[in-house]
Amino acid sequence: MTALANIRNFSIIAHIDHGKSTLADRFIQMCGALQDREMQAQVLDSMDIERERGITIKAQSVTLYYDHPNGERYQLNFIDTPGHVDFSYEVSRSLAACEGALLVVDAAQGVEAQSVANCYTAVDQGLEVMAVLNKIDLPQVEPERVIQEIEDIIGIDAVDAPRVSAKSGLGVDKLLEALVEFIPAPTGDRDAPLQALIIDSWFDNYLGVVSLVRVRQGTIKKGDKLYIKSTKDAHLVGSIGVFTPKPLDTGILEAGEVGFIIAGIKDIAGAPVGDTITHASTPDVDCIPGFKQITPQVYAGMFPVESTDFEKFREALQKLQINDASLFFEPDTSDALGFGFRCGFLGMLHMEIIQERLEREYDLDLITTAPSVIYEIVKKDGSIIYVDNPSRLPEPNNIEEFREPIARCQILVPQDYLGNVMTLCIERRGVQVDMRFMGRQVQLIFDIPMGEVVMDFFDRLKSVSRGFASLDYNFERYQVDKLVKVDVLINGDKVDALAMIVHETQSRYRGNALVSKMKELIPRQMFDVAIQAAIGSQIIGRSTVKAMRKDVLAKCYGGDVSRKKKLLSKQKAGKKRMKQVGNVEIPQEAFLAVLQVD
């Protein structure tokens, strides 16, 4: 049992690639939690995809015992947070479990928007934030400039910020000493009624749901009966302990500590992230504030290439959902693609990761339609509906108002690229809200339609700023605008999976661009394939994939012209008959062409 005064709960806030997971590895090594032969890069990133992409998706925790030079032994509970904009709710839950945070900044690159957003979240939640300069052994570091940036942009004192190299371990021992001095000890009465926060939950095939919790007050012991506030269910604690990073069964968790609970919960919905746990004997304990149900921001249709894989696909999604409460799916049918699922995601990265995991871990071949956001539609009779699939829109003459979601985007960009970034935001129908100059960086705040942000805004932002701009966004409001649905017809048949919702002013351009892109992607058939873009019954763009044809006149050397005409008309009649019964094969790239229309 560790006294409250000797516990430190902290998190690391960092932008992608600023060295958060590497610094965690050094902490684990220095506190002797793993032997050298067990060490591997990114110890806490347990998924293969996390290691390959170098990103952290799920929150992880590790309890380390640190012997301070003053002779005291401290329990350090480090809670790892995701760094990507799609996973910001998981970050806020991880931070709610801490008293302090280390803001790790790359001493060469400087401050990025994602760190700023997460840092503001930490400050709002009352955490002490300590700046740390990482990668100090690189030749191109500019520590003085970066310290100035941290003070200008985030507003925390960084003059005495420890300078470390997580890769080589330089300065990490001094950082651990500073951390113990700087971050406050947790408070909480160990004899009060139990109140604990669920930081993260995941599913284990043998144990059921494993929940990572932070005990605010009270004590949890093995065999206790727990009560989960939002689901109102009671469960018996089967196993309880801490990660060192390997699970270590301690049989008890007390106020101020972070650890895991296994209580035989069969479904991840039974232990939602951010919820409050108490004892079944004291169900009236107050909830820890900040809990919210996660709502998907981006929707896309996913269909198995082989229709026989449908059940396998359903099982795969159910298994993924067990571990990822933010993934939403419902059955969907498409005239062009058959049976599949409409899936909801937190953002484009989340969607890519889910698709990659389905293909890699479950060996599925999938066709994914272009993603869309949720639109609010006011119908003529005054009723309001929410539509996430363009093919489910009501008829245009039945729509009174079309409202689209607007995202508040915070962009940090060096002054040299300010013009390019502002042009991009305005092209994407953005409205400037604020602009602040902070040292060599500029903070731009724009309101941009969510549909424009989720498409390829992030990639375009990186390319116009040579990778220096960074973005953080969140949903702001719904706003009325003139939007239309553009349908794609192939040989006169609507392909529901290719429909898109665009602004009226861009509809002709986007329709024509999509049609010409499709022409490149659909392979030539034995008959002409007409590709058309239409708004309602009005055709706004067309192109034709020309038929492959055999030279039927090859063996006519001279001779009567009527003989040639007869052969040509016979071929023409055959092609016409083919067109009536022929199916056009549409490759996966064509469905994603909607994304690439600039």
Curated annotation (Swiss-Prot):
Localisation: Cell inner membrane
Record key words, sorted: Cell inner membrane, Cell membrane, GTP-binding, Hydrolase, Membrane, Nucleotide-binding, Protein biosynthesis
Reactions performed catalytically: GTP + H2O = GDP + phosphate + H(+)
EC number assigned by the record: 3.6.5.n1
GO terms for cellular component: plasma membrane
Pfam families reported in the protein's UniProt record: EFG_C, GTP_EFTU, GTP_EFTU_D2, LepA_C
InterPro entries from the UniProt entry: EF-4, EFG_III/V, EFG_V-like, EFTu-like_2, G_TR_CS, LepA_C_sf, LepA_CTD, LepA_IV
Membrane topology: Peripheral membrane protein
Regions that span the bilayer: none
Record domain tr-type G: where: 5-187
Function: Required for accurate and efficient protein synthesis under certain stress conditions. May act as a fidelity factor of the translation reaction, by catalyzing a one-codon backward translocation of tRNAs on improperly translocated ribosomes. Back-translocation proceeds from a post-translocation (POST) complex to a pre-translocation (PRE) complex, thus giving elongation factor G a second chance to translocate the tRNAs correctly. Binds to ribosomes in a GTP-dependent manner.
Family that this chain belongs to: Belongs to the TRAFAC class translation factor GTPase superfamily. Classic translation factor GTPase family. LepA subfamily.
PANTHER family: TRANSLATION FACTOR GUF1 HOMOLOG, CHLOROPLASTIC (PTHR43512:SF4), TRANSLATION FACTOR GUF1-RELATED (PTHR43512)
Protein name: Elongation factor 4
Organism this protein belongs to: Psychrobacter arcticus (strain DSM 17307 / VKM B-2377 / 273-4)
